[in-house]
Amino acid sequence: MTDIESLCRLTEAVEAAGADIAPTYLEYVQLSFAIATDCGEAGRDFFHRLCRVSPKYQREHAERVFSNALHTQRGEVHLGTAFHLAEATGVSILSLIHI
């Protein structure tokens, strides 16, 4: 399974649960780096889909945060961080891993 396929499945599970997996600014930034590092530009829409459940979501701000993550490329944060954030909010990821 590719990183994009994994991210797609994670996004669908998070949306189905209605979970805010990045409620703090730190988690929000970590999520942007995790997706940007492993999925690049192809992850941008997924980042928006994962963030828009938050009452604090602002599309323009999310665009800037993700663009910054793409350009900065901090390689120490990977897609596993997104799965960890989802799991921490109660989203079941076991079925996603074994598919």
Q: What residues fall within each predicted segment?
A:
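Modules that initiate DNA replication and primer synthesis
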Residues: M1-L96
